[in-house]
């Protein structure tokens, strides 16, 4: 399993696993998408290239997931797979996903990615992210 769900007061969180920054960022994209919808029911039909910057790995995690959430809210497109390269405070990422079908039932409606309790620690094998619902 690449992630687990964390109960967090009125919010929800994820703990993702990986031993590199790239694994943690990619697994976080999948985990957040799977919190929103059952991604097993979607097929990859869209591809998007993004350059994400931040001062810290935690900034990049928040910026990356916020960008994925932007596409959900604005274009009704859910990106649920990512391939990426992390170097010098920059994440070069390709996102893969699908338009959200009209008849789909949302698991959770995520309003925002937060800095609350955030951690990105490949040396310890995990990253933690909390979302506002």
Swiss-Prot record:
GO molecular function: calcium ion binding
Gene3D superfamilies: Archease domain
Lineage: superkingdom: Archaea
SUPFAM superfamilies the UniProt entry points to: MTH1598-like (SSF69819)
Binding annotation for Ca(2+): 11, 132-133
UniProt GO BP: tRNA splicing, via endonucleolytic cleavage and ligation
Record-linked InterPro entries: Archease (IPR002804), Archease_arc (IPR022952), Archease_dom (IPR023572), Archease_dom_sf (IPR036820)
Keyword Iron: no
Keywords: Calcium, Metal-binding, tRNA processing
Task of the protein: Activates the tRNA-splicing ligase complex by facilitating the enzymatic turnover of catalytic subunit RtcB. Acts by promoting the guanylylation of RtcB, a key intermediate step in tRNA ligation. Can also alter the NTP specificity of RtcB such that ATP, dGTP or ITP is used efficiently.
HAMAP family tied to this protein: Archease_arch (MF_01222)
NCBIfam families referenced in this protein's UniProt entry, alphabetically: PRK00407.1
Family in the record: Belongs to the archease family.
Name of this protein: Protein archease
Species whose genome carries this gene: Thermoplasma volcanium (strain ATCC 51530 / DSM 4299 / JCM 9571 / NBRC 15438 / GSS1)
């Amino acid at each position: 399993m690449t992630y687990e769900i964390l109960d967090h007061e009125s919010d929800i969180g994820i703990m993702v696993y990986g031993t590199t920054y790239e694994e943690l960022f990619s697994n976080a994209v999948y985990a957040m998408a799977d919190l929103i919808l059952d991604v097993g029911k979607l097929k990859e039909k869209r591809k998007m290239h993004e350059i994400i910057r931040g001062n810290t790995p935690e900034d990049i995690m928040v910026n990356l997931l916020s960008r994925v959430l932007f596409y959900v809210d604005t274009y009704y497109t859910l990106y649920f797979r990512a391939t990426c390269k992390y170097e010098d405070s920059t994440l070069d990422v390709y996102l893969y996903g699908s338009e959200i079908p009209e008849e789909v039932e949302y698991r959770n409606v995520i309003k925002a990615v937060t800095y609350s309790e955030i951690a990105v620690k490949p040396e310890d094998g995990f990253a933690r992210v909390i979302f506002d619902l």
